[in-house]
């Protein structure tokens, strides 16, 4: 449709990537974590309209986000106008899932007071002036989630090696008997590691950080193996996990 002239900072869409490589779209491949700060500094220009997906919006201007937060708090605060996409594909049970917090920018930034994955320091919604909300568009459009390759003997072995290594360090006293928070990546190897940790009953239930909560994490939460997962977004490719 040639509707995009410029985009930052991240994409996984093959058609978009082709358009960028053909010079049809200007693209800034900055780190995802830097985008909100770049916007606040004004490097991306003025924010006229913010389009925000939500599972609920209230008359007093509370916007409850869906599967991700990202730069939504920043653009909502800076935008002249806000359009809310109220997506019925996301349950209202997602209300309370988010921890909305904007840090100060350098050189005035202070420490972010999070000391364990289950800490909360913000609000479960974005608070905006309701007068800025110029439209609410109702949709029912599930997320397009990419599934990962199924586990195979190689990934299973990698996962088991990591679990054995951590269990051995716990037995040696290097890791305390209560275990420690883990940070997991994304993909079939990360899923294999989490699966092996979940099966090893010598490792107690643990909290974890991850960039994206996937089906494997949801399964471990249901089994009582993961006590809490802290992430930037959810990428769930079955309706059972989403529920």
Where are the language model's segments positioned?
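Conserved alpha/beta enzyme-core scaffold
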Residues: 1-243
